[in-house]
Amino acid sequence: MLINKTKGKVWTGRVKIADTFFKRFRGLMLTPNVNYALVFILPSETRLNASIHMFFMLQSIDVIFLDSSREVVDLKRARPWRFYVPKGGAKYIIETPVGVIDYLNAEIGDEIDWEVEEERSAIPSPVEALNKIGIKNSNGTISLAEPKPKLKGE
């Protein structure tokens, strides 16, 4: 979720974080359908570090450049195969689907924040799986079974 704290507007889409060199390097390149926001956390707040390229991008995106206090220093509608440098130094870059800047009514000077939803794994954790193991057969073989509920008198 992206929040324009200055204007009280909220975009409820998914947000992912790019906080390592490889995540920042990959970015949204070759992503066929950008349907989430990607927040880049940069090592320093400079114009050079915050410059982006749109090589190998399959579609246009909205880009919000923020300083270390999360205030907007520049906004761009970025098109494929272009290079962009923000007007001021940026510590954070938010790449979003086209239209999010308009939806948030974002302008230079606005404070933008975000919340990242915890990604859930489709694979159960080992602890959950162990709770389901029980001895079911009289011959001692182990099989998957729901644990027997304890009665009050036990």
Swiss-Prot record:
Gene3D superfamilies: Protein of unknown function DUF192. Pfam families: DUF192 (PF02643). Belongs to the UPF0127 family. This is UPF0127 protein TSIB_1463. It comes from Thermococcus sibiricus (strain DSM 12597 / MM 739).
